[in-house]
Every structure is written in structure tokens, then in C-alpha cells.
Curated annotation (Swiss-Prot):
Organism: Mycobacterium tuberculosis (strain ATCC 25618 / H37Rv)
Active-site residues, record numbering mapped to chain: N397, C399, E401
Listed name of the protein: Ribonucleoside-diphosphate reductase subunit alpha
EC number: 1.17.4.1
Catalytic activity: a 2'-deoxyribonucleoside 5'-diphosphate + [thioredoxin]-disulfide + H2O = a ribonucleoside 5'-diphosphate + [thioredoxin]-dithiol
Source superkingdom: Bacteria
Regulation: Under complex allosteric control mediated by deoxynucleoside triphosphates and ATP binding. The type of nucleotide bound at the specificity site determines substrate preference. It seems probable that ATP makes the enzyme reduce CDP and UDP, dGTP favors ADP reduction and dTTP favors GDP reduction. CDP reduction is stimulated by dATP.
Site annotation Important for hydrogen atom transfer: residues: C189, C426
Endpoints of the signal sequence: none
Pfam family, one: RNR_N
Length: 725
């Protein structure tokens, strides 16, 4: 007998104080009142809390399947193929029930309507017809903890505490899929290389289909593809260039989505010195011919230092045939340092080249970003100088924060692998900075997060794309992110981008890095192994640690010194770093990559955080949510008494945002999704100035450009949801 739908006791999910009665205001109307000032000109925060309360009473409780007890519920969910039996079989039933009790005892409440709405719309387990709810937030947290802890009861308990107390939030694919029988992979996104042959192109399209089906966004490197008009088998003017491959990929992504749950999403990256660069960029023009227009793929451009230097001198910039470069140097174009070899390639008559004006190239970039928000930018030399791993980073991902080394695969004629290369998958999750600063044990919070993300890597086996599986097995790479920086700073009455704000960002990321490395070192010691290639890394040589052992890192402002002291968080000393360096050189670290800061989307609403580490876009954010229409979301910790600290990103301006990201970047081995915000008075010159400022400040990548302009609302595109946390 299936269970009946009866309202669960209100206390298990909403507020226990509800007495019922006619005439209640609809939750949607209550939420809308957040956007209206009251008679005294105050923001009505209480209306949003009431909306969350009424959402449970009017909707959630009435549509939640009722069970008499936990045993009945667990038995039903396993029997009916809702839960993965294998996950629960790793524990005694008694432990699972105790863990559920532990979660429910926390008396979790969604502080905002949008948080509750997002959770029930997008994450919770529903009946197969999609009409009724089978889980509360606590149940989802417990299933995620049980899945990631893989039988380790102590870790499962710690994970429940970290997630339900809001300190650690796994990325959408992990939080959505863990423990469910019908599910996608827990991985956020993937990066593939495409080499200059039909086998690699064909295999890449198949890989894109396979990965998109499993729920990840996929970014592909097209830099190595020979340009339009290049020879094929020595016959001139034969190659079609990169555009037809982009068209094939666009169709593949629209076909393959994760059980209809998320639109397939793809990105393609091309080097600035590829001869097809203008054709590539033109695909995003509003007036582009339909034959070449690319509507749903995201574009990224890889720019080396030399391009900026040429523009500074107002010189021409040469574009080099990847086909010729590979013939001359014996390695694919993407694996060459263009900055290093630029003049050598200019002088080499064997390499075909064309020239464009360097400043015109940057002007074109800015025009396009005005029109479409694209392309993303990866500063190639900055990225590779900061890379502690042996090898070259050639491109980034759908949200421009993953920066890992990849190697090419070689194929036989039948498309089987002659040599499996190394491609990239991103195992993501983020810390809420405010809650982490409030943690009873800061070091433990970081360690539990690192262990959770390592579990995502350990449990992922994507056999349909051997290069992704190989990369994951070799590297155990993860990306610990951060969110709620602006929320935390405002709570502590610090302005975003101020000296104190930048000082805090620097010391916080510095301290997180220390504990993340220490946790990875511990895992390496426990397991008696490290990531493949560790001995060729800057961790093994000790070079990575020099900047931490050679100078003192401490707060420059009294305010930040006090924040860490009041929180009881010890800031690592040079001696701490020396000891860690010794242990790492002796035993290694388990994870090749540890940190990456993604553009947290849905999970920051559930977790009640400001997104990533950029400023808020408005004090009360307006979102369009499916059938319900407009929904309003208040910035975390905002009250009518501290509004001055909630200046929005457009008012703050790009310099303070870049300065803040630069402070964090120096302690993050991968990238940070950095969106630039401009007022509608901005010109393409302003965009170029911001790009140059970011490059000079050591920023690794730039994500979207957003203009405060009604016509451009929505340039963020659904695309990044798959990599957004």
C-alpha cells in the first residue's frame, strides 16, 4: 500500500506556532511585500519570513507524503526505487535513524521564502509523477552525508552538522543526486580537449553527449583545430575551421540534458592568436547570419601576456596556423607558450600567419561583451605562472573557475583509444564565509569539506569517457569554493572593497588554504598515496610554500585582527607553514587541486548567502522563477539599520571587486568566477580598462560582463546553472 498524503506535523518543516484559520495572505503576495516599503519607509523583512512560514502551511505540508515512522519511510523509499539501497546498506538501520534524529533536532528553518521554494522545486526527492514531496531538507542532508561518508559513521555525523548548520554546502549535482536511485552524477562540470583530427572531433562530440546526459556542463578546447581554409592532406583551402564543430556541439547539448532536470550546457574556448578568432567571436553577434550564429554555447577566449603588450604598443598581432605550429614544434598549438615563442613564430616562414590590430581585437571583445556578456577570458600566462602542477593549463570551464592541467588523447581509426589522455572533472562545494567564521572549530569545518569533496571524486566513475575517468583517478582534484563574503562583511559593518574588506579577504583565504592543504596531507598519510605526478609539482619541490615561509602574513587592520581573535581562529604562522611543508614533502597531498570559487547560484539561496565572493546585485534581488513568476530575495544579514553596507556591485565598481578577488586569488590554486558589473553609462573603453586592470592585478579569469540595463537583463543565460553551485 502506498502511503497517503497527509500533512506532516508542521513542526518538522515549518514553524510550530501556526494555529490555522481563514484569511491568511497567500505566500507569494507576502514575499512580494518585501519589495515594498512600509508606512515608515522601512523594508518589510518580516513579510518574507512569514511568506516562508505560509509556504509550508499552504503548500509543502499539504503535498508531503506522510509516513508513520522512519522505518516505514525508509522501507518504502528503498522498495519503490527512490533511494539507493547500496548507500543505506553501509550503515545499521539504527545509525541511520539516529542520524535523522540528529538532523531534525537542529530545528532547521529556511530564513527566506526563495530558499524554501528553491529547495522544494529543485532539490528534494519527489514522487515519480513530480507532484508530491518525499523528503524534508533534513532528509536530503542526511542522504548526502550518508553517501559521501561511505560507511564512516563519524564523518557522516560531522557532515550533517556542517551542512545543516549552513557552514558547508555541496554543489547542486551532489546535493540533488546523492542517495537517489534515479540520478545523474554528483559532479558539476567537465573539461575536454579536442585535437586536430576527425577521430578526436568525433569522440569529443560523443563525450559531450555522454557527460551532458549525466548532468554536467562541458567546456571544450578548440585552439588546436586547424583554421578555416587550412590544407587537408596538402590540398589548400579545405578546412572548415572551428564554427561547424561549434554547431555540432550546440546541437549535442540541446539534445542531451539530465533527465530533463537541467538544460545541457556547453562552452568552447579558443586562443586569441588562432586565425579563426574573429569568426569565433562573430557567432555571438546579434545580427550574425543564422548559418554561423551560436545561441546557446558559452564562449571563452584564452589571452596571453603578449597580446596586452602588443596592444599597449599599438602593434599588429599575428595569428598562427595551429596546423603549421604543430608540424613545426611537434606539439599541439595549445601546449605552446605564445608569449615565449611569439617572435620566433612570426619569423618562421613555415608557419602561416595573418595579422590584425591588437587594439582592434580588444575593442571587438568589449563590443561583444556589451552585446552578449561573452566571451569569458582566461589570462593564460597568469594562470600558468600560478599553477603548482607540472604541465600546461590550456582552458577553463563553463564558469571560468576550474584551472587544471590536461593532456591529449590519441585515437585509433575505429575511435578506440591508442593513448588515454587526461581530461578534467570538477567536484565542487562551497563554504558560507559568515557561518565558517562562526564555526566552533574552523579547522574541522575545512577538513570535513575537503573530505566531502574528496568523496565525490572517489565515488565518481564515468566509464563512458575514459579520459575523464583517468583524469579523476589520477588527480583526485576538487574545488572548495566560498560564498557570502558580502553578507559577512556587512554583518560586521565593513564596506565591500574597503581596506578592511580586502584585508579580511586576504587573511581568510590564507587561513583556509593552510587548513585545506593540511587536510589533503592528512588524507595522503591515511591512504599512503598522493595524486599522480605529485613528485613533479611545486608542492614536492617546496617552491609553493616559499611565499608563506619567507614572509609574515597577518592582518593589517585592527578590525580584522579582532574578528579572528573574537572567533577564536588562529592565523597560521611561518612555523606552522614550515611544519606543513615538511609533512607535505614527506607524504604528499591527496588532491592535485583544492580550491576553486564558483558563481554559486541556487545553493546560495538555499544556504542564505550572497553569491560567491562578489557584491550583491541589489538589496532585494528580483528573480523570475518558472510558473510562479517574480520572487524577491533579501540580502543575508540585512536589516533596516545596516543598509549602508549593502551597496550593490554596479555602485561599488570594478576596481574594488577586482582588488577583492586579487586578495583571494593569491591563495587559490585554481580560479575564481569574477563577473564585472557596469552602469549603463559605461563604454567599451571602460570594459577594456577593467580587463587591463584585472590582468595587471593578477586575476586569472573573467566571467560575465553585466550591464545595469533593462535590455540586457538575462545575459547571465541559463547555461551556467550546471556549473553553478
Amino acid at each position: 500500500m502506498p502511503p497517503t498524503v497527509i500533512a506532516e506535523p508542521v513542526a518538522s518543516g515549518a514553524h510550530a506556532s501556526y494555529s490555522g484559520g481563514p484569511g491568511e495572505t497567500d505566500y507569494h503576495a507576502l514575499n512580494a511585500m518585501l519589495n515594498l516599503y512600509d508606512a515608515d519607509g522601512k523594508i518589510q523583512f518580516d513579510k518574507d519570513r512569514e511568506a516562508a512560514h505560509q509556504y509550508f502551511l499552504q503548500h509543502v505540508n499539504q503535498n508531503t507524503v506522510f509516513f508513520h515512522n522512519q522505518d516505514e519511510k525508509l522501507d518504502y523509499l528503498i522498495r519503490e526505487n527512490y533511494y539507493e539501497r547500496e548507500v543505506l546498506d553501509q550503515y545499521s538501520r539504527n545509525f541511520v535513524k539516529t542520524l535523522l534524529d540528529r538532523a531534525y533536532a537542529k530545528k532547521f528553518r529556511f530564513p527566506t521564502f526563495l530558499g524554501a521554494f528553491k529547495y522544494y522545486t529543485s532539490y528534494t526527492l519527489k514522487t515519480f509523477d513530480g507532484k508530491r514531496y518525499l523528503e524534508r531538507f533534513e532528509d536530503r542532508v542526511v542522504m548526502v552525508a550518508l553517501t559521501l561518508a561511505a560507511g564512516d559513521t563519524a564523518l557522516a555525523e560531522l557532515l550533517v552538522d556542517e551542512i545543516i548548520d549552513g557552514r558547508f554546502q555541496p554543489a547542486t549535482p551532489t546535493f540533488l543526486n546523492s542517495g537517489k536511485k534515479q540520478r545523474g552524477e554528483p559532479v558539476s562540470c567537465f573539461l575536454l580537449r579536442v585535437e586536430d583530427n576527425m577521430e578526436s572531433i568525433g569522440r569529443s562530440i560523443n563525450s559531450a553527449l555522454q557527460l551532458s546526459k549525466r548532468g554536467g556542463g562541458v567546456a571544450l578546447l578548440l585552439t588546436n583545430i586547424r583554421e578555416h581554409g587550412a590544407p587537408i592532406k596538402n590540398i589548400e583551402n579545405q578546412s572548415s575551421g572551428v564554427i561547424p564543430i561549434m554547431k555540432l556541439l550546440e546541437d549535442a547539448f540541446s539534445y542531451a540534458n539530465q533527465l530533463g532536470a537541467r538544460q545541457g550546457a556547453g562552452a568552447v574556448y579558443l586562443h586569441a592568436h588562432h586565425p579563426d578568432i574573429y569568426r569565433f567571436l562573430d557567432t555571438k553577434r546579434e545580427n550574425a547570419d543564422e548559418k554561423i550564429r551560436i545561441k546557446t554555447l558559452s564562449l571563452g577566449v584564452v589571452i596571453p601576456d603578449i597580446t596586452f603588450e602588443l596592444a599597449k604598443r599599438n602593434d599588429d598581432m599575428y595569428l598562427f596556423s595551429p596546423y603549421d605550429v604543430e608540424r613545426v614544434y611537434g606539439v599541439p598549438f595549445a601546449d605552446i607558450s605564445v608569449t615565449e615563442k611569439y617572435y620566433e613564430m612570426v619569423d618562421d616562414a613555415r608557419i602561416r600567419k595573418t595579422k590584425i590590430k591588437a587594439r582592434e581585437f580588444f575593442q571587438t571583445l568589449a563590443e561583444l561583451q556589451f552585446e552578449s556578456g561573452y566571451p569569458y577570458i582566461m589570462f593564460e600566462d597568469t594562470v600558468n605562472r600560478a599553477n603548482p602542477i607540472d604541465g600546461k593549463i590550456t582552458h577553463s570551464n563553463l564558469c571560468s573557475e576550474i584551472l587544471q592541467v590536461s593532456t591529449p588523447s590519441l585515437f585509433n581509426e575505429d575511435l578506440s583509444y591508442a593513448k588515454v589522455g587526461k581530461d578534467i572533472s570538477c567536484n565542487l562545494g562551497s563554504l558560507n564565509i559568515a557561518k565558517t567564521m562562526d564555526s566552533p572549530d574552523f579547522a574541522q569545518t575545512i577538513e570535513v569539506a575537503i573530505r566531502a569533496l574528496t568523496a565525490v571524486s572517489d565515488q565518481t566513475h564515468i566509464k563512458s569517457v575514459p579520459s575523464i575517468e583517468q583524469g579523476n583517478n589520477d588527480s583526485h582534484a576538487i574545488g572548495l569554493g566560498q560564498m557570502n563574503l558580502h553578507g559577512y562583511l556587512a554583518r560586521e559593518r565593513i564596506f565591500y572593497g574597503s581596506d578592511e574588506g580586502i584585508d579580511f579577504t586576504n587573511i581568510y583565504f590564507y587561513t583556509v588554504l593552510y587548513h585545506a592543504l593540511r587536510a589533503s596531507n592528512r588524507i595522503a598519510i591515511e591512504r599512503g598515496t598522493h595524486f599522480k605526478g605529485f613528485e613533479r609539482s611545486k608542492y614536492a619541490s617546496g617552491e609553493f610554500f616559499d611565499k608563506y615561509t619567507d614572509q609574515i602574513w597577518e592582518p593589517k587592520t585592527q578590525k580584522v585582527r579582532q574578528l579572528f581573535a573574537d572567533a577564536g581562529i588562529r592565523i597560521p604562522t611561518q612555523d606552522d607553514w614550515r611544519r606543513l611543508k615538511e609533512s607535505v614533502q614527506a607524504h604528499g597531498i591527496y588532491n592535485q587541486n583544492l580550491q576553486a570559487v564558483p558563481p554559486t547560484g541556487s545553493i546560495s539561496y538555499i544556504n542564505h548567502s550572497t553569491s560567491s565572493i562578489h557584491p550583491i546585485v541589489s538589496k532585494v534581488e528580483i528573480r523570475k522563477e518558472g510558473k510562479i513568476g517574480r520572487v524577491y530575495y533579501p540580502a543575508p544579514y540585512m536589516t533596516n539599520d545596516n543598509l549602508e553596507y549593502y551597496e550593490d556591485a554596479y555602485e561599488i565598481g570594478y576596481e574594488k571587486i577586482i582588488d577583492t578577488y586579487a586578495a583571494a586569488t593569491q591563495h587559490v590554486d585554481q580560479g575564481l568566477s569574477l563577473t564585472l558589473f557596469f552602469k549603463d553609462t559605461a563604454t567599451t573603453r571602460d570594459v577594456n580598462k577593467a580587463q587591463i586592470y584585472a590582468w595587471r592585478k593578477g586575476i586569472k579569469t573573467l566571467y560575465y560582463i553585466r550591464l545595469r540595463q533593462m535590455a540586457l537583463e538575462g545575459t547571465e543565460v541559463e547555461g551556467c546553472v550546471s556549473c553553478m553551485l
